[in-house]
Amino acid sequence: MPLVIFVDDSETALASTRMVTNSMPIEVKQYTEAQVALAEIKAGMIPDLIITDLNMPVMNGLEFLQALRNNPSTNRTPTLMLTTETKPELKEQGKALGLTGWIVKPFNPAQLKQAITRVLRL
């Protein structure tokens, strides 16, 4: 089963993503801190898809994405940004770092499910 990790400092957002993914043929791990997810990745966890929030304390989504791109095991891992931000300059920064897609919160559950299905080719 493909492994999808969600990183968001909001427990509410994580609960919403859990509801969307419960019926999908994927394994899901959730983290409230990007640096914790990054530590697990560096310890050997290899996700098939990473979905992260942008605005988080300590390490934001773009910093997390940069760290993922600097890691040989995740430098090509598809990554989606799930955020309330809509600023074009932030989207451009993400695109420059190899971001796969941008989903705006509050998200439509079908949109998130479709994005996961498309990226993982389920």
PLM ranges: what are they?
Residues 56:
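Receiver (REC) domain active-site loop signature in two-component systems and cognate sites
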Residues 107-116:
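C-terminal output helix
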